[in-house]
Structure formats: C-alpha cells, structure tokens
Regions:
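Nucleotide/phosphate-binding catalytic cleft detector across ATP-hydrolyzing
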Residues: 78, 83-219, 224, 273-278, ...
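Local cysteine-cluster metal-coordination motifs and their immediate loop/turn environment
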Residues: 39-105
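A contiguous, well-structured pocket-lining segment that forms one wall/lid of small-molecule binding clefts
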Residues: 476-543
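Glycine-rich phosphate-binding/hydrolytic loop that grips phosphoryl groups
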Residues: 357-372, 532, 582-619
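Glycine-rich phosphate-binding loop of actin/hexokinase-like ATP-binding domains
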Residues: 220-224, 229-257, 320-334, 368, ...
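Short glycine/threonine-rich loop-to-helix capping motif typified by GTGT followed
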Residues: 306-321, 396, 547-549, 558-578, ...
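N-terminal phosphate-binding loop and adjacent alpha-helix
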Residues: 248-290, 416-417, 425-433, 526-529, ...
Length: 664
C-alpha cells in the first residue's frame, strides 16, 4: 500500500497526465482530480449539467501502472447521469466526474475536451512543396441512357463509358459506391464525375454532373502519444487544415510495450484499443473538414504513417508478437485498403494507404522520415533521430542505410517527471540558468516573454518535455549537477535553490511564492534513462556502420522540432557533431505522409527505400547495454564531445556535498 494509505483508500491513476494518488472511499472522480492536481474541467459546480467533467474509466489489468481495475471500481450511473444521457447523450464508456464515486482502484482517462489546459499538439504541416500526382483522380464521363431494346445495368454502362473515354478498364465498384450510382446518374443528366484509384482500380466516389471542386486527401501521422493530420487538396498538395489530438490509447499505457501487455493480458484488449484509435482519427477527420468548410465526402484518399504497434492496432491485429523475439510483423509491406475498413467515414469508397514498416520495432513513421529527408542522397554520414516515446533512428553513409528503435519511454514528453505535463499553455518549455547567480529564468507555452521580463504574467502549470531537457542540461552547464547526474547541495554549489529532498537534493526552477516547480533527483534519473537509450541506439548503428563519428544530425518529429540542439548535445542525447550541422526537420513523418498522399511516385520510392534499409535490433544486440550504461553520464562516460567545449568540472558525493574539482 502507498505510504499514508489506509484500508479505506483507493489508488486513482489519471491519464494522459500520469498523475496518481490515493483518495478515500466515496470520493467523486472530480474531487479526486482536484486533490491530485489533474486538469478536469467543471463549470456547473458538480451538478451534472455542464458535462465538462466527462471522463472514461478503464477496466482490466494495467501492468504499466501496477493496477487492476474491477467492474465496480466506480459507482453505477446515478439518476443525474441517466437524465443527462436521456437529454444530451452520454457515450457508453463515459462518466460524469462529478457524479462517479471511487469505490476501488481505478484508472481514469481525461479526454481532450474535458481538460482545462489541452495539450498543444505541435505538428504543423511542413511548408515544403510536394509533387501533385495523386493515386486518386477525377474523371468526367457521359453515360448512355438506359434503352429497353438494349438492356444493361447502369454500372455496366458506366464502366463502358470510362473504358471508352479514359481507357479505364476492369474497375471495381464497392457496394457503398454502387448504392448511390443510380441517383447520381439521374441527378447529373447522365453525366457524372468519378473518382478512381489508379493503383487498385477501385472507384472511390461518384458525383452527379461535371464536378469542379478539388478532391481531398488526409495525411496522417499516427503516433503513440498524439495523432496529427493534414487535410490536403490533391490537385496541388496544398494543406487546407491541420490538427491533432491526444491518442486515446494512452489510458492503456503510455509506451508501446504497455499496450502490447494490455492486449496480451486482457481479452478483447486489442479490439478496445483499435476502437479507441479509429474513433479518434475519424473525429479528427471530421474536425478538419469542418475547419476547411468541406464535406467529408470530398475526402477520397488517406496516407497513414505509424509505428509497428500502432500499425497493428489500427488494422485490428493483435500486437502480441511484437512484444517478444523475433518481433514478427503480421504484414510489413504497404497496405492499400478501403478507408471504411479503418472506421473512417469519408467518401463512400475512399481509399487508405499505409506506408510500409521497416521491421518489428521500426515502423512506417521512420520510413516516412527517410522518404521526406532523403538522407541517402547526402554525401555525409547522417543520423536522423525521430524523438518520441519510442525513438527511431536511421544512419546513412555511402554504403547504405541502417535503422533501429530505442525504447526511450515518455519522460521526454513530460511524463514520469514530478512537475511534468504534456505540452499545454502554462508549461515551462524553455530554461536558462545564469552560471554566476545560479538562478533560472523560464518561458512557458502561450507567453513569449521570459519570467524575468515585463509582460510575463502566465500561470505556470508545470514543465513539458523540451523544458525538462533544457533544465537538466542547464543545470549541468551551471555546475549544479555533476557528470553522474547528481544534484549538489546549496553549500557545494553556492546556490540557495538547491534544497534537500530526502537523502538527495532538488533544484528550484521556478516559484511564485506559493508553488514551486522543482527538478528532483528522480526527474534527472528519468531523463538519464531516456537519453541513454537514445544514445545507445545511435552508437549501435555507428558500430554496425564502422564509423566513430557522424557529420550531421537531424532531429525529426514534432518533439524534435522543439529540442535545442546544444542542450540535446550537453545532455548526451545525440553523438557529438558540429552544432551548425545539428538541425530540426520538423514533423518529417507527417511530411512523408503528405508526399505519399499526393504523389504516386513517392509511394514507389518509399517501398523501394524500405527494402534497402538494414534493421538493427536493439533488444538483442550484445553491446546495447554496454552503450546504455556508458551513456548514463552527462554527456557521456567515455565518448568525446569536442564541439561542446569544456563543462564545469564538479563532483558531488552521495549526499550532494563536496564540490571538489575533478581533473580532466
């Protein structure tokens, strides 16, 4: 039992924040959220009127959280919830937090619409141009009217007209399209516009008359933490709307292996996670169409990139085999499907293209990054790092391409950090520590001013991933932390903001006089574990390639776009390289998805590229653990970082004292 718990206490874990604690039996979910500092909205005073506090309780085993949730963990729906359901509708898996009472250990997911400070999904579309040669194109065709003397079906005459006028033979017309064919022909006066997928010969939609409106497509980056999508005009590749949401599968586990475990341990777990992610993706598609002022039926194609576990769960495939050697994919090649098979309500016969996966732990998202960045065209040894809960790395030299994945976990995204949170307004995202005064200044999402500048009036709510990376690196640069990651005492560092915390010390990053945001020793250890996994993966690829250094490092992914290269190198997340050759590619996976959506040639290229990439499996590589241990030091126990210059030579004892100079 957690410290301070009593027999009447129950453990409550909230996702996606990861906050947890024990509350007394009979506490409402809303009160539990407030007690634990969780963002659960409510504006009606807990009367069950506003619905802002809707939440989704989990059920089953959650080994990641050390939790088993029984069917009676929450009280049954009461009269207030029943009334709300009758009047406004309440989804079967939703509860009103102000009415649901905690009766046992429980996991509660707070959906984006119920969060006071919603996460900022920072995956904007790239402004890079794409070639417009889409797989799905529109054809206008005049169809002969029916004739009693030469009876034939409308479909047969449509096929004949398409073959005659456009050379399109052997087309497949899905039932969803066929059901609307006769109405379209008659409303259009026997002239219709037909959307055809050139790759599969499938008709995606039929509209009456000669249609002028452009066909639309959806480029999707389906990550384990966030889902980002771009609604594109297929005629020129222009992005009409972009958006993102949290992946609702977070409630089943923040990292991929937790979701694999959930599928293995809970009957129906795969279907549950599949339904959650399909529902979120479909809702996001609807939001983007509404934002662009276009109809869902205008969307005729989608290109989707994702890691192997998300790939399997989107397809409804049990991911259990990905949790054990040899990590076999059910299918690694590109998949061409009907969008409706993935739960997407778009054009009746809309298509979906899933980019190929590289191997069991390196997915289509890494393939999309390789497509977008074309590192194989460079004349330098290039390391591409897609930073996330499951980092994926690609190393390219003149001899070929190597790829691996590293299980960094969610610490880089603010999870498992004492004051950590997802990226949302109020989260500290930038940190600078004066090496002389040892005092920190911060900048938060939603406010351009630094904390020591006029105009800084933001309410600081916590620290997100880019903030904790900069905080730990700045502590090392300021001499508040030694190479082992140990935080020094106030006496050893000369900094009053280094305060005792149990047997170790913590650093006060920010305070408003009533609340402190601290960086604790446990926080530093979490970042060390994450960065060590990332660096070890890079070193493993370098070993395989027979190189001791890289010429260029590209940080990909939405999170990579917000990481400072110098802080990443100080921390030892990436190998040493010239700082002017360490840069961000932004959401490269999303751009790769957009390329595959708008250009058939890009699909051919990525499928050929994947066949050339050699996979290195970190889970069974003998030297991975060796590299991991050496990378625990900040920046590294033995690898040189000449481009950084000297770091403070400090060493603190087990209690953070000392401060003796260490010879180099």
């Amino acid at each position: 039992m957690d410290g301070g718990a009593t027999a009447g206490d129950h453990l409550v874990v909230f996702t996606p924040s990861g906050k947890r604690g024990r509350v007394p039996h009979g506490t409402t979910v809303l009160d539990a959220a407030r007690r634990l500092g969780v963002d659960l909205d409510s504006v009606c005073g807990g009367r069950g009127i506003c619905s802002k506090c809707q939440c989704s309780p989990g059920a089953g085993d959650f080994p990641k959280h050390g939790l088993t949730v029984g069917p009676d963990a929450l009280s049954p729906r009461n009269a207030v919830e029943a009334r709300y359901d009758r009047v406004r509708g309440l989804a079967a898996d939703r509860r009103l937090g102000c009415q649901a009472i905690v009766q046992g250990d429980v996991l509660i997911d707070v959906p984006p619409e119920s969060q006071v400070h919603r996460q900022v999904v920072r995956k904007a579309a790239s402004d890079r141009a794409v070639t417009a040669d889409p797989a799905v194109r529109a054809y206008v065709v005049a169809v002969e009217e029916p004739d009693m003397d030469a009876p034939s079906g409308d479909l047969e005459r449509l096929r004949a007209a398409l073959a005659r006028d456009h050379g399109l033979d052997g087309l497949t017309v899905p039932l969803q399209v066929l059901t609307g064919l006769q109405g379209a022909l008659r409303r259009g006066g026997w002239t219709v516009t037909v959307a055809v997928d050139a790759e599969t010969g499938v008709v995606a939609a039929v509209w009456p008359g000669a249609r002028d409106a452009a066909l639309l497509g959806l480029a999707v980056d389906l990550g384990s933490t966030t889902i980002a999508a771009h609604l594109c005009d297929l005629s020129d590749g222009a992005v009409l709307a972009s958006g993102g949401v949290m992946n609702p599968q977070i409630r089943f586990g923040e990292d991929l292996m937790s979701r694999v475990s959930y599928a293995m341990m809970n009957p129906g777990g795969t279907a549950e996670m599949t339904g959650a992610v399909r529902g979120a993706l479909d809702a996001l598609a609807g939001e983007l169409c509404a934002e662009a002022g276009r109809d869902r039926g205008d969307v005729v194609d989608a290109a989707i990139v994702c890691n192997p576990v998300m790939h399997h769960l989107l397809l409804g495939i049990d991911p259990s085999e990905l949790g054990q050697a040899p990590f076999a994919l059910a299918a690694g090649d590109a998949q061409r499907l009907g969008a409706a098979e993935l739960g997407l309500a778009l054009a009746p016969g809309a298509r979906a293209y899933l980019l190929p996966c590289i191997a069991g732990h390196v997915g289509a998202d890494a393939a999309a990054v390789a497509l977008a960045e074309a590192p194989d065209a460079a004349d330098a040894v290039t390391l591409v790092v897609d930073v996330g809960t499951n980092a994926e790395l690609i190393l390219v030299d003149r001899r070929g391409l190597l790829a691996c994945s590293s299980p960094t976990g969610p610490a880089f995204e603010g999870a498992q950090i004492s004051a950590g949170q997802r990226a949302a307004p109020g989260a500290i995202e930038r940190v600078r520590i004066d090496p002389d005064t040892k005092r920190a200044r911060v900048r938060v999402i939603g406010c351009e001013a630094w904390s020591d500048e006029p105009g800084f009036d933001a309410a600081v709510t916590g620290i997100c991933g880019s903030g904790i990376i900069e905080a730990v690196a700045e502590m090392r640069l300021a001499g508040l932390m030694d190479p082992s990651g140990l935080i020094g005492s106030a006496e050893a560092t000369g900094c009053a903001d280094c305060v005792p915390e149990g047997r170790t010390h913590a650093y006060r990053l920010w305070s408003d006089g009533t609340r402190d945001v601290m960086v604790t020793q446990t926080d530093v250890r979490a970042i060390q574990l994450a960065k060590s996994a990332l660096y070890a993966g890079a070193r493993l690829l370098m070993d395989e390639a027979g190189v001791d250094a890289v010429d260029r490092v590209t940080l990909a992914g939405a999170f990579g776009a917000h990481i400072s290269p110098v802080h990443a190198m100080v921390l030892g997340m990436i190998p040493d390289a010239p700082l002017d050759r360490v840069g961000s590619a932004g959401n490269a996976a999303g751009h790769g998805a957009r390329m595959a959506l708008c250009d058939r040639g890009a699909r051919t290229r990525v499928e050929a590229l994947v066949r050339r990439i050699r996979k290195v499996e970190t889970a069974v590589a003998p030297r991975f653990q060796e590299h991991f241990v050496a990378a625990n030091a900040i920046p590294h126990a033995s690898d040189p970082f000449p481009h950084l210059g000297p770091l403070p030579r400090v060493a603190f004892g087990a209690g953070g004292g000392g401060g003796r100079r260490r010879r180099r």
